[in-house]
Amino acid sequence: MLLEVKDLKVEFPTRQGLVKAVNGVTFSVDSGETVAIVGESGSGKSVTSLAVMRLLQSPGRVSGGSITFDGADILALSENEMESVRGAKISMIFQEPMTSLNPVYRVGDQIVEAIQTHTDLKYKEAMERAVEMLRVVGIPSPEDRANDYPHQMSGGMRQRVMIAMALSCNPKLLIADEPTTALDVTIQAQILDLIYNLREKFNMGVMLITHDLGVVSEVADRVVVMYCGQVVETARVDQLFERPLHPYTLGLLQSIPRLEDDDSKRLYMIRGSVPNPLHLPAGCPFSDRCDSCFERCRREVPELRPVPGSPDRTCRCFLVEEGSDDDR
């Protein structure tokens, strides 16, 4: 297994109390596989990715669990050892490329800096590699565009530059945090196709952070659904779309607009909002928003358990435990 996260806990001490942003998250990513981490804002998915990269900002801290990458305990590495992993073996691309690129440096030089940080290449050789990576990600006239500043490029081109930078040192794992949110639909499709094709070409694992299940259906192999810092369901992508088990997953799927729906049909909306992490419900965190909630849900916190008859998927719901998911 390339990446294995077990019972990960991340906390943020605040004046109001302790925020458990990630609370016992477990999942894995293998080489050549795309695992999508899905959830609303505040679900803990981005904090999970930052924990894997060891980029948590103070006062955030990992308070429990383990992160194993390619056989190494990420949490036990020194900062110098982690710097040799970050950017070289694990790379990350972010939601808004304009804020990730330095506006006063040419994009080619920014890729060169990433390459020289992790290799012994001289500037000329590193620039040749940077130009080649720009070509790989589909930027036309890469020799010329390497001399451009970020503001001279469109949003889609800037995201391609970020992908070129992330892949310049041949990482084994790519973490993509909402890589298409700031782009229009046509460019979104191009970037997703690019990530998929590069995954196939380099046999790298991809950890895709997103709230968009439409994106998930296009590129993911497996899905991890998060809510309030916990994993509530894991499944192969075909299983999840064919038969979602957790009411939250079902709500996310039902809220996707479909072309075949009647214009007069009201779009489904999950009622309420994500609860304050300082004041979670006593039982299941989703109980106040769940249409299938019953008394046990308000008293007890369900555990993430294997689904009977489907050993490769899990669900955190009493309905599934009791065999009452009603074949949804």
Which residues does each PLM region occupy?
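P-loop NTP-binding/switch modules centered on Walker-like glycine-rich loops
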Residues: 54, 175-179, 183, 187-265
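Conserved ABC transporter NBD signature motif
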Residues: 62-73
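ABC ATPase NBD coupling module
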Residues: 74-91, 109, 117, 239-244, ...
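Short catalytic/signature loops enriched in Gly
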Residues: 140-144, 234-328
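A short, proline-enriched helix->beta-strand linker immediately N-terminal to the Walker B motif
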Residues: 168-172
